[in-house]
């Protein structure tokens, strides 16, 4: 009988959920759900100094916002807990003590200064820096001497000599490492806390993880973890290392890269939709059959085949994300779009936090003008700018339009029509423009463009009668008068 698929996403609470981690979580989630397996969240919080307040809560909050759920974890429990590494220290202790007893690990009393001097010497000689094994076989007398000096040891794993470590990677196919390329590595730090490679190997085994899907930057950790599995006689899970995400300059995506918004909470704050972010991230290093790019979560689960994980770096295309979010925005009802937009208009000082019924209806109509055009909620501030300014600046193209010989005649006639209107309704504005056509004989672009540029400042924009109606009589007449002179 085949084992049930069990995968995990194991963040460190050293920061908030960013694109790279979100992709790792998402691919594990899709892999598990596609195969009716289990998706586990484990918190790797042993690097206590780097943990940030609220980091764990933020990770879980934004995974949920993206639409993911999990079967086991810190907040939902499960039979393989605890799911927080700092609550598993006794488990690790028993196991590393077993390695010490069997001579597969040993105490190393070298100081940071001694290790740094060794490293610098290796670099100066053109060698690859690695631990040279100075404390591999200490005598009892040497150990007593170091302890008398008050030295606190770390524990190192004794790397087997002359061994090949080969594994079939789900993404990269066969990957090989040689043990002689590794020095004996630390499995327990001087403070008694296990290192990443030891704790991860132990947890993955005890939690019965069948597949380890993670970023390419972890591939050099794999042979070390394989050595630990081997030392305990444990079955080794299947590994899959997803390719890097690169920016538009084809450089590895870095948290310090300011050209790209990195954190999921920032996208939420900007008024992006979780379904669109889910869709976009799911295509960063994985592709379905065919050309279609918009899929629901259920569709992704149904078709997610790990064999289609890409071997090439995944390009993070910000413009494509905007396009994709726009596709999802178009499908939303107006209430949702208004809800995504209002906080940004308040933040920009365009509207107050409390609105009268009349103001609510007006701003709703303004947002409706841009529903089809908006890429994300915060974009409404820039798109709707003309409604909140007394005067408009004309685009270069618009300035050329206003130089036309017919412009004064058209605008005077239109101003007269607007002046006579009892109510600024789109139908009435449409009728007023038709009346100007009849009165002046101008039509098409010669008629519409001067009116659009004079009233909105733009050569392109939303439906003109609707926009003019929402601008209001006073603002429209003031703008027309400015051009007429």
Swiss-Prot record:
Source domain of life: Bacteria
GO molecular function: ATP binding; glutamate-tRNA ligase activity; tRNA binding; zinc ion binding
GO terms for biological process, alphabetical: glutamyl-tRNA aminoacylation
Residues involved in ATP binding: 255
Span of the annotated motif 'KMSKS' region: 252-256
Motif mapping: 'HIGH' region: 11-21
Predominant location category: cytoplasm
Pfam family, one: Anticodon_2
Reaction(s) catalysed by this chain's protein: tRNA(Glu) + L-glutamate + ATP = L-glutamyl-tRNA(Glu) + AMP + diphosphate
Keyword Aminoacyl-tRNA synthetase: yes
Subcellular location: Cytoplasm
GO cellular component: cytosol
TM annotation in the entry: none
Keywords, comma-separated and alphabetical: Aminoacyl-tRNA synthetase, ATP-binding, Cytoplasm, Ligase, Nucleotide-binding, Protein biosynthesis
Enzyme Commission number: 6.1.1.17
Similarity comment text for this entry: Belongs to the class-I aminoacyl-tRNA synthetase family. Glutamate--tRNA ligase type 1 subfamily.
UniProt cross-references to HAMAP family, sorted A to Z: Glu_tRNA_synth_type1
Descriptive protein name: Glutamate--tRNA ligase
Gene that encodes the chain: gltX
